[in-house]
């Protein structure tokens, strides 16, 4: 039982850590490519900015899904019921 809970805690840490790391890398690439595009064609900067914010919103959804899965494993672990029964 304790092993299952400790592995769940490790899994939660990995899920949250990798989701945060992936999002940070994604935002860095997105910002860099936006600046490249805006520097190359300054007249396209407003349209690129709108698209960048849309993609940033979609990119931000990934760690939110990871946090929800981590909260599921933290507070309502589905594997504990199989162990008890």
Curated annotation (Swiss-Prot):
Residues passing through the membrane, by range: 10-30, 53-73
Positions marked as site (Reversibly protonated during proton transport): 60
InterPro entries recorded: ATP_synth_csu_bac/chlpt (IPR005953), ATP_synth_F0_csu (IPR000454), ATP_synth_F0_csu_DDCD_BS (IPR020537), ATP_synth_F0_csu_sf (IPR038662), ATPase_proteolipid_c-like_dom (IPR002379), F/V-ATP_Csub_sf (IPR035921)
Any Pfam family matching the protein: ATP-synt_C
Keywords on record: ATP synthesis, Cell inner membrane, Cell membrane, CF(0), Hydrogen ion transport, Ion transport, Lipid-binding, Membrane, Transmembrane, Transmembrane helix, Transport
Annotated Gene Ontology cellular component terms: plasma membrane; proton-transporting ATP synthase complex; proton-transporting two-sector ATPase complex, proton-transporting domain
Compartments where found: Cell inner membrane
Record bears the keyword Cell membrane: yes
Gene Ontology MF term list: lipid binding; proton-transporting ATP synthase activity, rotational mechanism
Main location: membrane
Bilayer disposition of the protein: Multi-pass membrane protein
Record-stated family: Belongs to the ATPase C chain family.
Function: F(1)F(0) ATP synthase produces ATP from ADP in the presence of a proton or sodium gradient. F-type ATPases consist of two structural domains, F(1) containing the extramembraneous catalytic core and F(0) containing the membrane proton channel, linked together by a central stalk and a peripheral stalk. During catalysis, ATP synthesis in the catalytic domain of F(1) is coupled via a rotary mechanism of the central stalk subunits to proton translocation.
Quaternary data: F-type ATPases have 2 components, F(1) - the catalytic core - and F(0) - the membrane proton channel. F(1) has five subunits: alpha(3), beta(3), gamma(1), delta(1), epsilon(1). F(0) has three main subunits: a(1), b(2) and c(10-14). The alpha and beta chains form an alternating ring which encloses part of the gamma chain. F(1) is attached to F(0) by a central stalk formed by the gamma and epsilon chains, while a peripheral stalk is formed by the delta and b chains.
Xref: HAMAP family: ATP_synth_c_bact
Protein name stated in the entry: ATP synthase subunit c
Organism: Aliivibrio salmonicida (strain LFI1238)
High-level lineage: Bacteria, Pseudomonadati, Pseudomonadota, Gammaproteobacteria, Vibrionales
């Amino acid at each position: 039982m304790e092993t299952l809970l400790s592995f769940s805690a490790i899994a939660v840490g990995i899920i949250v850590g990798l989701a945060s790391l992936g999002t940070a890398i994604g935002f860095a690439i997105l910002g860099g490519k936006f600046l490249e595009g805006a520097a190359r064609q300054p007249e396209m900067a407003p349209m690129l900015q709108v698209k960048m914010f849309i993609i940033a919103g979609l990119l931000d959804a990934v760690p939110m899904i990871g946090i929800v899965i981590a909260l599921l494993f933290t507070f309502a672990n589905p594997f504990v019921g199989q162990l008890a029964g």
